[in-house]
From Swiss-Prot:
UniProt keyword Cell cycle present: no
Binding site for Fe(3+): H74, H76, H244, D319
SUPFAM superfamilies with a match to the protein in the record: Composite domain of metallo-dependent hydrolases, Metallo-dependent hydrolases
Binding residues annotated for Zn(2+), in chain numbering: H74, H76, H244, D319
Name of the molecule in the record: Imidazolonepropionase
Pathway: Amino-acid degradation; L-histidine degradation into L-glutamate; N-formimidoyl-L-glutamate from L-histidine: step 3/3
Annotated disulfide bonds: none
Keywords for the protein's UniProt record, in alphabetical order: Cytoplasm, Histidine metabolism, Hydrolase, Iron, Metal-binding, Zinc
Function summary: Catalyzes the hydrolytic cleavage of the carbon-nitrogen bond in imidazolone-5-propanoate to yield N-formimidoyl-L-glutamate. It is the third step in the universal histidine degradation pathway.
Highest classification ranks of the organism: Bacteria, Pseudomonadati, Pseudomonadota, Gammaproteobacteria, Enterobacterales
Length: 407
């Protein structure tokens, strides 16, 4: 009989989808095991016959499925306002250029966010965060990017820090100051990039407000030369980088980000084979964002087969934002990744667990059920992991465990 220490907690009578690639079964499935949690981490996974059947800290899950906590590795969670009216305009035939000329588009969100009080932004973001937590998310990336000026970018990152301080969910904050050119720099995007590189990145990094730097390398964002200035600045300070790349056109952004050993290249609908090879060589994760693909009614799909052939890890994320992916649901993103992009359900699960952890640099502690990893996991009223992907309108979450505590 296995000896338990005071304070140990056990989940028994479970079906474990460990998402551990070292296990041969699909999803890393293993039956008739028990999970021992000690001080917020998984202490061990052992045959349940080695443990007592009952006790003060022994939870009998009656055969339910247990998976790692979900990880949403790409969100724009902190913003004010919404863009529902301009979505209706687009459906009625208005062009993006027409909407932008009326003050719509990303600058509408920037204006609303700049004007919004920090406490209000926090309350808005907290409600969104708890929606994701209710789906089993235990680690969440939050980008800035709706300030496009030092004061508001800092405000957004402070909100992310306040959310993290609640200890309800892990937050990985990302500085996305190079998201778009603000209206006041419309005729001087290079000048804005200078502000980002010489002021925003160093000052906000010194304050410890973010973990990584992101950028939007695209025909409607920043060109390759401007994007490289951002990457050079970040890497000179030892800051991990990532990028929104190849969403609407092929500019070579994935190759650029991979050359700087980027954590991830996100969107990647127009990614080519050279970009895929560069991602493999740079250790860069491909992050698929099917919500934006759906909402923008795009037709160019990411090269999933090439990513498989080159063995590039593929993550899946919600991309929750008010303009192009207003879907605060990782379950829905998993389903869309399968239906629209051709991922298998097992690939979708890897995309919101171990590959999403790698996209955030957390692969040594998150995204799998293994001894030594964080005790972040979800108990589901389900028999198979595919059920969560198959029916995104139903949430079979039974219990969410964060840092070893039922939450």
């Amino acid at each position: 009989m296995r000896q338990l220490l005071p304070g140990d907690t056990v989940w028994r009578n479970i079906r474990l989808a460990t998402m551990d690639p070292q296990r041969q079964a699909p999803y890393g499935l293993v039956d008739n095991q028990a999970l021992i949690v000690r001080e917020g981490h998984i202490c061990d996974i052992v045959p349940e016959t080695q443990l007592p059947v009952s006790g003060d800290n022994i939870h009998d899950m009656q055969g339910r499925l247990v998976t790692p906590g979900l990880i949403d590795c790409h969100t724009h969670l902190v913003f004010a306002g919404n863009r529902a009216a301009e979505w209706e305009q687009r459906l009625n035939g208005a062009s993006y250029q027409h909407i932008s000329a009326q003050g719509g588009g990303i600058n509408a969100t920037v204006s609303a966010t700049r004007a919004c009080a920090e406490e209000t932004l926090y309350l808005l973001a907290r409600e969104r965060m708890m929606r994701l937590a209710s789906e089993g998310v235990t680690l969440l990336e939050i980008k800035s990017g709706y300030g496009l000026e030092l004061a508001t970018e800092e405000k957004l990152l402070r909100v992310a820090a306040k959310l993290a301080s609640e200890n309800a969910i892990d937050i990985s904050p990302t500085l996305l100051a190079a998201h778009a050119t603000p209206a006041e720099y419309r005729d001087d995007p290079d000048g804005y990039i200078t502000l980002v590189c010489e002021t925003m990145i160093p000052q906000l990094w010194q304050k410890g407000l973010f973990d990584a730097v992101d950028l939007f390398c695209e025909s409607v964002g920043f060109n390759v030369a401007q994007s490289e200035r951002v990457l050079q600045t970040a890497k000179a300070l030892g800051i991990p980088v990532k990028g929104h790349v190849e969403q609407l056109s092929l500019l070579g952004g994935a190759q650029l980000v991979s050359r700087y050993q980027g954590l991830s290249a996100d969107h990647i609908e127009y990614l080519d084979e050279a970009g895929v090879a560069a991602m493999r060589d740079g250790g860069t994760v491909g992050v698929l964002l099917p919500g934006a693909f759906y909402f923008l009614r795009e037709t160019q799909r990411p090269p999933v087969e090439l990513l498989r052939r080159y063995q590039v890890p593929v993550a899946v994320a919600s991309d929750f934002n008010p303009g192009t992916s207003p879907f605060c649901s990782l379950h829905l993103a998993m389903n869309m990744a399968c239906v629209q992009f051709g991922l298998t359900p097992e690939e979708a699960w890897a995309g919101v667990t171990r590959h999403a952890a790698r996209a955030l640099g957390r692969q040594a502690t998150h995204g799998q059920l293994r001894a030594g990893y964080r005790a972040d996991f979800v108990v589901w009223d389900a028999e198979q992991p595919v059920e969560i992907v198959y029916e995104p309108g139903r949430n079979p979450l039974y219990q969410r465990v964060y840092r070893g505590q039922i939450s």
